[in-house]
Amino acid sequence: KYKVALSGSGADEIFSGYYDHQLMYLYEVRNNKKLYQEHLNKWKKYILPNIRNKYFRNPHMFFHNKKERSYIYDHNKELKKFFLNPKKNIFKEKYFSSSLLKNRMLNEVFFENVPIFTHSEDLNFMQHSVENRSPFLNRKLFEFMQTVPPKFYMQKGFTKYILRKIIDKYVPDEIRLE
């Protein structure tokens, strides 16, 4: 019987792995023509064909308004009509950083994804008397990643580039580059 399980929670939020992160990354590197064009080309070739959400299909989503959040349901008139009791508290991001991408990631870590995921995981694992650990949420790792400039979060068209580089020697490419 298993006593401990390792979770991947926090990896996308700490290392930058979501679709909207890619669009914010393009915004972050917009003044570095080479880096911008390289990422945009890879994004169009490898990522865009897999995106079903119409809000994430525009690579310049944040160029006109860096506070754009129409993809979040309580800002979206189309989606609001499906709720019987729309939320009264409109989603507002807290300000942590002048970097659009870092600010988004920090909101996900402290208020959005991570608290919800870890709570659900803890309940599910406790149901089976298994201890859940989330190594990507290690405080020192988190603090280190806060010192890394956003331009290093993605490279060669890959999200979570730093994480992929770290595990290069230990994980086969067919898993690492998936």
Label each region the model flagged.
Residues 95-109:
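Structural motif
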Residues 171-178:
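PAPS-dependent sulfotransferase catalytic core
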Residues 109-123, 145:
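Short Ser/Thr-interspersed hydrophobic loop/turn segments at strand-loop and sheet-helix junctions
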Residues 9, 104, 117-118, 134:
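Residue-level recognition of hydrophobic positions within alpha-helical transmembrane segments
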Residues 1-90, 123-170:
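ATP-dependent adenylate-handling active sites, centered on carboxylate activation for C-N bond formation
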Residues 96-98, 112-117, 139:
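Short, flexible segments with low predicted structural confidence
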